[in-house]
Structure formats: structure tokens, C-alpha cells
Regions:
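Helix-loop junctions and hydrophobic alpha-helical segments within the transmembrane domains
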Residues: 327, 334, 338, 342, ...
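Membrane-helix entry/capping segments
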Residues: 294-298, 304-351, 383, 391, ...
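Surface-exposed amphipathic alpha-helical segments in non-transmembrane regions
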Residues: 13, 20, 25, 29, ...
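Transmembrane alpha-helices and their membrane-interface boundaries in multi-pass membrane transporters
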Residues: 403-417, 440-459, 467-519, 633
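Hydrophobic alpha-helical transmembrane segments in multi-pass membrane proteins
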Residues: 12, 16, 213, 343-352, ...
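Signature of alpha-helical transmembrane segments and their immediate interfacial
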Residues: 1-30, 439, 510-570, 597, ...
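Membrane-proximal juxtamembrane linkers immediately C-terminal to transmembrane helices
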Residues: 31-47, 82, 130-137, 501, ...
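Hydrophobic transmembrane alpha-helices and their membrane-interface caps
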Residues: 23-29, 34, 350-419, 459, ...
């Protein structure tokens, strides 16, 4: 194989350049995330049944949908939530490896079968089916600090003007509104209803009859009478808009000619569709929020950038006083983490180059293994793209680890060629041919042995297997590419770059005269270390039992400390944000929940001024469910550069918050 490419060096370069181009293209296409997608793909179904209790929603909506979803191909399990605000949510989890698009289509087909069995109100409002990750990528908040807009204004604007735009952003899987649109609220007076002998259904029927969209047709439309001189579309007042118009809706005509109207038995006012949420930003300013879920397999960084670009464009048309904020954003940590790993990768390449130059003492010989590094790394990115993986912490860490391994094959080729040139006096091309005949089998064997160490990780089960499968495949693919480059490109480089040694080997060690003395000193030092090591090994061989006992002791201590080390699924890291989950006793009101959230907010904004940048409180929902007794506080911390000392890290902030929050009575508070 090596002889084939030695006779066709241009072909070898074409292959190497092709591998690099494939890698460059793959880098621009690969999604970027902190970790591989651990959770299996899931499809969420959401619906609203306004006015219904949690039990009613469970019986009339959730159970009907669940019964129709049984038998879905590759579905593992279902989970559902319903609350007293009339919200139903069903999560369908599929087996790992399932195509989310196919799963979404199957769920849609099954849902159509369930629709006729659902309450009419639920059918009219519709059900949303989304394929997205479970965790929020970021939260977009609209706030007003000058008091010109209240929470109802912000919520209506968020849903009517912003939500649809963000849902169309590439990479966004779902936009969950922590808000409600404007709606006409009809407050019934039960005493007046009794006096008039009416029921709430009479009010509903009257509103449906008079608040309708009417198409009035055209004036002078075809076929027209002879001599028609005008054609125009007739416009009439359709949907009612003001409380006065709703109040004037007739409900019943009495025998005496009088009319009972809505205003006679109820009060109409403009409000929000539902009052489940109560949001405040920083020092109690009203807010509305949109939670962004990333589409499965999308690039997290690009998605966040696209969302912010869309908000920047929309902000040009904001009402006076409205501002946008991002109280929760996971992408800065991903960006910093990947940047740190890339920095480590570059440092590792530089260190490998310096170490090779230190030991080889020849810039030409050092360049050859160095050229192999970008070819193999970029080729590995292409392999990741083929497998459908992402650029994440584990794949990048695997590349950092692989750098020290992938240059070994090229170094073996270079050193053997130099040895043959020195001992047998052959020219570079002939020496390379003879060298490759000698070591081709060894190179393949080395690659297989090292790859075999990581093969078992590919077969780990569960979430651990999902995480470390990408790690192992990254290293294995880089090792295989390293062997291929050592057989294809490295011999061509040796034949063209290496030169026979000069008669004065000492003088030919380096072309840089100032470094000659350094390399002479280093070689002498290295030879002394080598001789000392040989003497130590000879001494150890004379006293086998004591050293075997020392070895056994080291192994025992290693096992002892390994068993005492704390374990964890993934390392705890300062991600630049905190989340506090609040749960009050069942039956608690929204007002009580807001009081607790205000105490939490005041602690972080007043006692943690050095670390906290902004804060968003949300009453009415949490990760545990929805309801007046639920709440959350999103805390965004300042940049890591401003929090260098240990007491300013996220773990220390949580440690200080726990005793303070534990003193708040009648609430369970979990800062994470």
C-alpha cells in the first residue's frame, strides 16, 4: 500500500486534502452542544380546557389521548400532567435512535383519531404537537421599567407579536409562552342570573351567536345585471372588540318587549385569557416570558444567535418603554466550555510539536508528524458527521487525548526512515520504501491494539453508553485515520522532506546555530537518564520480592482511594445560572406564592450583588407542575471573569442561599 502511494505522491496529497475538506465542511454542519443528547427522543402534546379542573382534564382529555397513543411503533412510555388551570401536557418517549420526524408524524396520525372524542372546547382551541428537547435552551423576557406597560400588555405583545416569529427561527423546536393573550372576561353575577331565570349556558350561547365572523359578499359581483357600474367588497362589523359591545349582546326578549342583555347579568372587561402566571423582572418590574426549546439535533449556539437576532429585529418596533432580556441562557456556558477545550486542543498540538522537535532535533523530521495532526483531526470531524454526532465536551476531549496518540504512527515512520538512511546510506525514497516494508504490519497492529482499548465503551448500555459511545468512536476513528495517514501521506513526506545526514552529525542536528549547544546538552542529559534507568531496572531485577510488594501496595492504595472517591453522573459545573424551584402547600394562593418569590428575589439581588446580574420570578408554574402553589426563580450570574474567587462561584452562592431560604416558612424551596 505504501509503495503504491510512494509511486503516486500527488494521489496521496489529493486524498489528504480531500479528508481535510470533508472535515472543514463537517465542522460547519455539526451541531454544537455541551453533552451528547442523553435523553431519548420525545414528542410533546399540549392542550387547553379553560375552566376545567385537573381531574376533568385528566378524564376528558389526557386519558382519551393516551388510549389512542397505545401501540405506537418504538414508543417506550408516556407521561402526562394536568393542572387546575385547564392545561394538559403529554410526553411520549421513544426508543433511542428513533427518527423524531417519523415519530412526530405517527403521533399526529394517532391524534387525529382521538380528536372527535375530545371536548368541543379543546377541539376548537386545538392541540400542539412538538418535537424538541425537554430542557429550555433559553428564556426571552419582555419587561418595562418605566411603568408605561403593565403585565397584561407585555403578555399580549409577547404572544401576538413575538411568539410566532421565534417559532419560525431555524433550530427552535417549541416556544412555550409564560403569558396569556388579551381576552374579554365575562364576570357573572349569580344573583342576577337567578332573578332572570338564566344559566351560564345562556350567556355562552348568546355570545357565540352574536360574536361571529361574517362574510357579507360583494356589491356588483358576477353575474351582474346589465349596466352595473360598481363592484366593491362589502365590509361589516364582525367580531366584537370592546366591553361595551359585549355588554350590549341581547340574551333574551321578554314578553313585555324588554331585552335582557349581558350587562344586566354580568360585567365585561378586557383582561388576559387566563391569569395563571405572575412574572416580575429584577426589582419587581412586570414581565412576560417565552421559553425556547431547541429542536432535536439542532446547533444550540446557532439557534440562540438566531433567536437573539430575531429579537434585535423585532425590538425596532417595540412600544416605548419595552425592553428584552435573557434571564436564562444556556449557550454562554456551552460557548465558553467548547472554547476552553479548543484552546486546550491548540495547546496540545503546540506541545506535541515542541516535544517532537526536542527529541528529533530536526525541523524537517518534526514537520512530517505535525502535518498529520490536522489531517487526522479534520478527518475525525467528518467521521462524527457520518455517525450523526455533535461537537460536544466529550468528543472534543477525545480529540485532545488522541493528539498524543495519533502522532506516534508518523513518528515511527520518520525515525525508521532516518535510521535506515543513517545506517545503510540509502537515499530518502529508497529508505522510505524499505522502512515501510518493515513497519507496515507494526503500524496496523499498534492502531488495532490502541483502538481495542476503547471498543468496549461503544457497547455500554443506557445513558452512560450514549455519552461515552461518542467518546470512544472519536478516539477509534482518529487512530484508524492516523494509521491510514502513516501509510498514505507520511511516506510521501519522508521521501520528499528528509535529507541524508551531513558527515558531522552534531553540526547537522539543527540548522539554528543558537540551539546547537542546547540539543547537545539535552542529548547528553537524556543519555544519562537512560543509563540511570537501565541501572535501576537491573537493580530491581536483583530484588524482585520487595518491589513486587511495593507494586501490590500501590495497587491496593489505588483501589482504596478509588472506592472512597465521590461518584456522580456528570460533574457539577458553574454554568453561570441558578434555578430556584418553589412549592407551597396544596391550596395556596398565587398571592402567597408571589410573597415567597419576592423574598427569594430580594435575597439574591441584595445579598449577592457581586455575583447576580438579573433575576426573573415566575409564579404559577415550575418543573414540578403548574398551579397557584408553584413558582420558579431564574437567576443569571455575572460573567465568569468577574467571579474568579471560590466564594463567588455558583456552588458557594447556593451554599449561602440554602440556610436563608430554609428560614422561609410554609414553602419548599430547592436552589439548584
Amino acid at each position: 500500500m505504501a509503495r503504491f502511494f510512494l509511486n503516486r505522491p500527488v494521489f496521496a496529497w489529493v486524498i489528504a486534502i480531500g479528508i481535510m475538506l470533508a472535515g472543514v465542511i463537517a465542522i460547519n454542519m455539526l451541531p454544537v452542544s455541551q453533552y451528547p443528547p442523553i435523553a431519548p427522543p420525545s414528542i410533546s402534546i399540549r392542550g387547553m380546557y379553560p375552566g376545567a379542573s385537573a381531574k376533568t382534564v385528566e378524564d376528558t382529555v389526557v386519558q382519551v389521548i393516551e388510549q389512542n397513543m397505545t401501540g405506537l411503533d418504538r414508543m417506550l412510555y408516556m407521561s402526562s400532567k394536568s393542572n387546575s388551570m385547564g392545561t394538559a401536557q403529554i410526553e411520549l418517549t421513544f426508543a433511542p435512535g428513533t427518527d423524531p420526524d417519523m415519530a412526530w408524524a405517527k403521533v399526529q396520525n394517532k391524534l387525529q383519531l382521538a380528536m372527535p372524542s375530545l371536548p368541543e372546547t379543546v377541539q376548537r382551541l386545538g392541540l400542539s404537537v412538538a418535537k424538541s428537547t425537554r430542557n429550555f435552551l433559553m428564556i426571552v423576557a419582555l419587561t418595562c421599567e418605566d411603568g408605561s406597560l403593565d403585565q397584561d400588555d407585555l403578555m399580549d405583545y409577547a404572544i401576538s407579536q413575538v411568539q410566532t416569529t421565534l417559532a419560525r427561527v431555524p433550530g427552535v423546536g417549541e416556544v412555550e409562552a409564560l403569558a396569556a393573550q388579551y381576552a374579554m372576561r365575562i364576570w357573572l353575577d349569580p344573583h342576577k342570573l337567578t332573578n332572570y331565570g338564566m344559566t351560564p349556558s345562556d350567556i355562552i350561547a348568546g355570545i357565540r351567536t352574536h360574536n361571529v365572523q361574517v362574510s357579507a359578499g360583494q356589491y356588483g359581483g358576477t353575474p351582474a345585471v346589465p349596466g352595473q357600474r360598481l363592484n366593491a367588497t362589502i365590509t361589516v362589523q364582525n367580531l366584537l372588540k370592546t366591553p361595551e359591545e359585549f355588554g350590549a349582546i341581547p340574551l333574551r326578549n321578554n314578553p313585555d318587549g324588554s331585552v335582557v342583555r349581558v350587562r344586566d347579568v354580568a360585567r365585561a372587561e378586557l383582561g388576559t385569557e387566563f391569569s395563571q402566571f405572575k412574572l416580575t423582572y429584577n426589582d419587581g418590574h412586570p414581565a412576560a416570558a417565552l421559553a425556547i426549546r431547541q429542536m432535536a439535533g439542532a446547533n444550540a449556539l446557532d439557534t440562540a444567535d438566531n433567536v437573539k437576532a430575531a429579537m434585535e429585529e423585532l425590538s425596532r418596533y417595540f412600544p416605548a418603554g419595552m425592553k428584552v432580556a435573557y434571564p436564562n441562557d444556556t449557550t454562554p456556558f456551552i460557548r465558553v466550555a467548547i472554547s476552553e477545550v479548543v484552546h486546550t486542543l491548540i495547546v496540545a498540538i503546540i506541545l506535541v510539536f515542541l516535544v517532537m522537535y526536542l527529541f528529533l532535533g530536526n525541523i524537517r523530521a518534526t514537520i512530517i508528524p505535525t502535518i498529520a495532526v490536522p489531517v487526522v483531526i479534520l478527518g475525525t470531524f467528518a467521521v462524527l458527521s457520518v455517525f450523526g454526532y455533535s461537537i460536544n465536551m466529550l468528543t472534543m476531549f477525545a480529540m485532545v487525548l488522541a493528539i498524543g496518540l495519533l502522532v506516534d504512527d508518523a513518528i515511527v515512520v520518520v525515525e525508521n526512515v532516518e535510521r535506515i538512511m543513517s545506517e545503510e546510506g540509502l537515499p530518502p525514497l529508497e529508505a522510505t520504501r524499505k522502512s515501510m516494508d518493515e513497519i507496515t504490519g507494526a503500524l496496523v497492529g499498534i492502531g488495532l491494539v490502541i483502538s481495542g482499548v476503547f471498543v468496549p465503551m461503544m457497547f455500554f448500555g443506557g445513558s452512560t453508553g450514549i455519552i461515552y459511545r461518542q467518546f470512544s468512536i472519536t478516539i477509534i476513528s482518529s487512530m484508524i485515520l492516523s494509521v491510514l495517514v502513516a501509510l498514505i501521506l507520511t511516506p510521501v513526506l519522508c521521501a520528499n522532506l528528509l535529507k541524508p545526514e551531513a558527515p558531522d552529525h552534531e553540526a547537522a542536528e539543527t540548522r539554528f546555530r543558537p540551539l546547537r549547544s542546547f540539543f547537545r546538552w539535552f542529548n547528553r542529559l537524556f543519555n544519562r537518564v537512560r543509563d540511570g534507568y537501565r541501572s535501576a531496572v537491573a537493580h530491581i531485577l536483583g530484588f524482585k520480592l520487595p518491589y513486587v510488594a511495593v507494586f501490590v501496595l500501590i495497587v491496593a492504595l489505588t483501589g482504596f482511594f478509588f472506592m472512597r472517591m465521590p461518584t456522580g453522573y456528570l460533574p457539577d459545573e458553574d454554568q453561570g445560572a441558578l434555578l430556584t424551584i418553589v412549592q407551597l402547600p396544596p391550596g395556596s394562593t398565587q398571592e402567597q406564592t408571589v410573597e415567597v418569590l419576592e423574598k427569594i428575589r430580594d435575597h439574591f439581588l441584595n445579598n449577592e450583588k457581586e455575583t447576580v446580574q438579573e433575576c426573573l420570578t415566575v409564579a404559577g408554574v415550575s418543573s414540578a407542575g403548574g398551579g397557584q402553589d408553584q413558582g420558579m426563580v431564574y437567576i443569571k450570574l455575572k460573567d465568569w471573569d468577574l467571579r474568579n474567587s471560590p466564594e463567588l462561584k455558583a456552588e458557594a452562592i447556593v451554599g449561602r442561599a440554602i440556610p436563608v431560604l430554609a428560614a422561609i416558612r410554609n414553602a419548599r424551596i430547592y436552589p439548584v
